[in-house]
A protein has these predicted regions:
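An N-terminally biased module of ancient metal coordination in phosphate/nucleic-acid-related enzymes
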Residues: 1-86, 189, 278, 282-317
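Domain-core and long-helix interface of multi-subunit machines
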Residues: 7-32, 98-193, 221, 258-305
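Short, hinge-like loop/turn segments at secondary-structure boundaries
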Residues: 70-73, 91-94, 143-146, 196-200
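A structural signal for the main folded, soluble domain(s) of proteins
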Residues: 72, 137-141, 237-240
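Acidic, His- and aromatic-enriched active-site or binding-groove loops in soluble protein domains
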Residues: 74, 78, 150-159, 203, ...
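Conserved catalytic scaffold of divalent metal-dependent phosphoesterases
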Residues: 77-81, 90-95, 126-133
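Short, charged, surface-exposed secondary-structure boundary motifs
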Residues: 82-91, 162-165, 190-192, 207-211
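A conserved mid-domain beta-alpha-beta active-site/ligand-binding segment of alpha/beta enzyme cores
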Residues: 199-263
């Protein structure tokens, strides 16, 4: 067990309103990825036991910069990268400057160039939710390529199923990557559901431990009920946001509100939709872990671990 008196906690995967529009086809102009203000995320994280706070908005550090002057915060982001062939991966990058953000964004369509830059700059880089279908399809070479350049692997994601997290943990043992945890919160209710622990006394020591890979993931996995509840919360927040925009007289707000009102009756089907998504996520994780592990075994490097076995060799702070 970790001695809590010698440990600092930080949710290394959390979003704010700066993550931009939803990526779901057809909803981009109606719903945002998140509606929480950076200060609200910080308050929620600290209330739930986090010692440090960072934001990992999609390809943006605007929210993180709002907190950057605080002693318990550091700047991070979630970079949307493309592997050869155009498939997406999400990478968490931590403790970066504005100049590094610009450099990362200019390289995000060339994964090898991005990894060369993070290695040169000693930027911790984590492959987030590696076995999630939400970033699109996977080819067999995508994850090995990502794992060769990353320093960490997210093995405890507060929105992903236990099976998806188990697959990530087993893959991380094969790839010998340090392990991280984060809530992947898109609503305030989910902030700090999962997090990363490092033995440290202050922010400087925490970041040094993060760079050294002396990390331990903690917290819970996602469930069908939590996923459904978060999507319902986002739907309500989307409606409230459009009402405020109409009151302010913003151009285009009224048609968007009308579109949401028209879609409202279909909310009764959301539990069915999320059930299908949740089931697909579990199948996707199992299938792609087996393909990844099979590739390792065929290459004669290591025998793949069984899912659910103790994480021997896992990173420890």
């Amino acid at each position: 067990m970790i001695d809590a008196a010698r440990t600092m906690r930080c949710d290394l995967h959390v979003h704010s309103r700066h993550s931009g529009p939803a990526t779901v086809p057809g909803l981009r102009h109606l719903v945002r990825e998140c509606y929480a203000e950076p200060w609200e995320v910080r308050y929620a994280a600290r209330e739930r036991g986090m010692d440090l706070v960072t934001l990992t908005d999609h390809d943006s550090i605007a929210g993180a910069l709002e907190l950057a002057g605080l002693p318990d915060a550091f700047v991070s982001e979630e970079v949307t990268c493309l592997v050869p062939g155009g498939r997406e991966l999400h990478l968490g990058v931590y403790d970066i400057t504005e100049a590094q953000h610009e450099a990362l964004q200019s390289r995000r369509r060339d994964l090898e160039a991005l990894f060369a830059y993070t290695a040169e700059q000693r930027i911790p880089v984590c492959v987030n939710h590696p076995f999630s279908a939400l970033t699109g399809r996977r080819e067999d070479g995508d994850l090995p390529l990502a794992f060769r350049g990353a320093t960490h692997l997210e093995v405890r994601n507060g929105m992903m199923s236990a099976r998806s997290n188990d697959c990530a943990r087993a893959a991380g043992r094969l790839a010998r990557l340090a392990q991280c945890g984060g809530s992947d919160a898109h609503t305030l209710a989910s902030v700090a559901r999962a997090f990363t622990c490092v033995r440290a006394n202050d922010r400087t020591e925490f970041l040094a431990g993060l760079r050294a890979g002396l990390t331990l993931p903690a917290g819970g996995a996602g469930t069908y009920a939590r996923l459904t509840a978060d999507i319902m919360r986002l739907a309500v927040l989307a409606g409230a946001d459009q009402v405020r925009r109409v009151i302010r007289g913003e151009p285009g707000a009224l048609p968007r509100l009308a579109a949401l009102v028209c879609l409202a009756p279909f909310a009764v089907f959301l539990p069915l939709v999320t059930a299908a998504v949740y089931a697909d996520e579990q199948l996707f994780a199992w299938r792609h872990y087996r393909r990844f592990a099979g590739g390792i075994e065929r290459a004669g490097r290591r025998r793949p671990p069984l899912l659910g076995t103790p994480a021997a060799g896992a990173s420890r702070p």
